[in-house]
Regions:
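Catalytic-core regions of hydrolytic enzymes
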Residues: 1-11, 16-123
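Active-site/binding-pocket entry motifs
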Residues: 18, 62, 131, 164-165
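A generic structural signal for alpha->beta connector loops
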Residues: 50, 106, 136-137, 153
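Active-site phosphate/pyrophosphate- and oxyanion-stabilizing loops and adjacent acidic/basic residues
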Residues: 81, 127, 146
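Active-site-adjacent mobile loop/cap segments within catalytic or ligand-binding domains
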Residues: 86, 100, 137-196
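Active-site-adjacent substrate-binding region
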Residues: 118-142
């Protein structure tokens, strides 16, 4: 892309927060906390490489009007608004997955099905995540229902770092060293996406 110093900006979105814990792990880990920890580590990595990083949330909170009727919708709208106002090179939303079969595991990247750029980025990111687990056979996946993917005006991907329903992965995702490894892979993935 044509990245200049002026617009070397990435938005990192840590899914959930506050009254909305997201998925709850088999080890009782809350998705909202894991998301923020990983995003903070990505932020550090990107800043080291000269990128400016805007976080949709820096602490454990929901966004938007806390008095609003449907807090979740206000929260999602507020996230989209931050992304569209900032107009970064890309937005990356950090989430964790969950499934009723606890054997299911592995990171997976989602993109908006009508975005060529989103698809390219998601595939590149999925490849970057192989450094965390080279046995992960998951492919980047199109989606046309996620509000965040539909409403953002810049290339946006969602990275589901792993399954909190898988005991082994849930343990890893709450481990600082593993979070750092995951964050490093995502940082490299972001840079590969936007600088090529």
């Amino acid at each position: 892309g044509n990245v200049t110093a002026k617009n070397k900006i990435i938005v990192l979105d840590s899914g959930h927060g506050g009254d909305d814990p997201g998925k709850i792990g088999v080890n009782q880990a809350k998705e909202k906390d894991v998301n923020l920890e990983i995003a903070r580590k990505i932020k550090k990595g990107l800043e080291k490489k000269g990128w400016e990083v805007v976080m949709t949330r820096e602490k454990d909170e929901m966004l938007g009007d806390p008095q609003a009727g449907n807090k979740k919708i206000h929260d999602m709208k507020a996230r989209v608004e931050i992304i569209n106002k900032t107009m970064p090179q890309a937005a990356v939303s950090i989430h964790q997955n969950s499934y009723q079969d606890e054997q299911i595991r592995g990171a997976q990247v989602f993109y908006y099905s009508h975005s060529e750029e989103g698809k390219r980025m998601a595939e590149q990111m999925q490849k970057a995540l192989l450094t965390v687990d080279e046995t992960n056979t998951r492919q980047a996946k199109a989606n046309d229902t996620y509000y965040l993917l539909k409403r953002t005006e810049v290339p946006t991907i969602i990275v589901e770092c792993g399954f909190l329903s898988n005991p082994e992965e849930a343990a890893k995702l709450t481990d600082t060293k593993y979070q750092k490894k995951m964050a490093d892979a995502i940082t490299k993935g972001i840079i590969a996406c936007v600088e090529n």
